[in-house]
Regions:
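Short, acidic/turn-prone active-site loops that include or flank metal/cofactor-
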Residues: 58-61, 100-101
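An anion/phosphate-binding loop that grips the pyrophosphate of nucleotide cofactors and donors
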Residues: 65
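Rossmann-like NAD(P)(H) cofactor-binding subdomain of soluble oxidoreductases
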Residues: 80-114
Length: 114
């Protein structure tokens, strides 16, 4: 399966973020996938599972992203997005999230993107 996004960055290596990274890596023609995590120990575990693009370096993770998936708790989305913008998040990438609610994240981060 070919994706329209050559580089996908997942911010957050918990259950949802890690599962997405594994699913994307398993595609026949996978995009470049970066999985950003805070904890260096998580890097080891993710690499052992076959996620090669796992990193604690936010700049490395977002630099060439065409799609960014926020896979962190809702309360962490705004500060993480600010940090990602400061780290070089491309202006034209698509940003989405895996949160269970949408209004609060939209209210919290829309001013950062306009």
């Amino acid at each position: 399966m070919k994706t329209d996004f050559p580089t996908i960055t997942i911010l957050g290596g918990g259950l949802l973020g890690g599962s997405l990274a594994l699913a994307l890596a398993a595609l026949n023609d996978p995009p470049k996938v970066y999985l950003w995590v805070r904890n260096p120990e998580t890097v080891k575990g993710a690499k052992a599972l076959g996620i090669s693009g796992v990193t604690t370096d936010l700049h490395e993770a977002v630099l060439n992203a065409s799609l960014v998936i926020l896979a962190v708790p809702v309360g962490a989305m705004e500060p993480l997005l600010i940090a990602a913008l400061d780290a070089g998040l491309p202006a034209k990438c698509l940003i989405t999230d895996v949160g269970s609610i949408k209004r609060l994240p939209h209210q919290k981060i829309s001013h950062l993107l306009l």
